[in-house]
């Protein structure tokens, strides 16, 4: 159990670090995808507001381009392993410029929509739409205003104009726009007003969301997935038990260099057993000389057989039949 506790603790730490990395990556992908959606809306509505009329220019779509490119880099970098840090740093740089652009455009578009667009005469039905077959043709119209002299206004084709906002050749009341050229109807002016405020609100949302996204990507760019630790635990070797052990067999040299042993008694020796007198049952004799002479080999008995002995360095004689 003691040897398994460090490995279990290491596995738990690796699992925690891997889970934290995956959680950070999911958060990074979520905020960058959200920023990409917001930037797409900013670009779409900004382009719609810019192309709605000719004489009113809107720059609210620029932050959408910068924030969208930065969010795409963030999505790609969040799914990388090797070049993740470089890609996320580039994403943070673009998002930072997009945040600055969103702040500036939100102020400019908001101020422009609040101070230079007045829809009260349009809602009151005092604006007129002029359309001719010749687009470049200029027409003079007379604006009748109460308590003022009639004024002549030169307008182009496909123009929505409001005489209540025109001040007889001078700048309109508080710099308000009194004509909108290249529109299909006066209702396009209402759409332009709503689009401007929508782009302004989206730029404010993109401003704060870009700050949050840059912070999340900045905390995730230095994180790396933790590899599982390989723990090598040296276990004590167990004693080996040998079964069916064979006795040691002496080598061939032991038999070769040793003195030859005498063989046991042969059948011939047993036939002449009379040469060995039987011992008395009462015990051994007290006379050692007599006892020794009784075990001596008789002179008339044939000699015992013993194999010839040849030294190791001497060859045996050749065989003769």
From Swiss-Prot:
Q: Which UniProt keywords apply?
A: Membrane, Transmembrane, Transmembrane helix
Its domain of life? Eukaryota
Q: How does it sit in the membrane?
A: Multi-pass membrane protein
Question: Which ranges of the sequence are coiled-coil?
Answer: none
**Regions that span the bilayer:** 29-49, 56-76, 88-108, 200-220
Region named Disordered? 279-300
**Which InterPro entries does this chain map to?**
TMEM255 (IPR028014)
Write down a Pfam family by its short name. FAM70
- Places the protein is found: Membrane
Q: Name one GO cellular component term.
A: membrane
- Regions of biased composition (Polar residues) lie at 279-297
Entry's family note: Belongs to the TMEM255 family.
Q: What is this protein called?
A: Transmembrane protein 255A
Q: Which species is this UniProt entry from? A: Xenopus laevis
The organism that produces this protein has a lineage beginning with: Eukaryota, Metazoa, Chordata, Craniata, Vertebrata
Name of the encoding gene = tmem255a
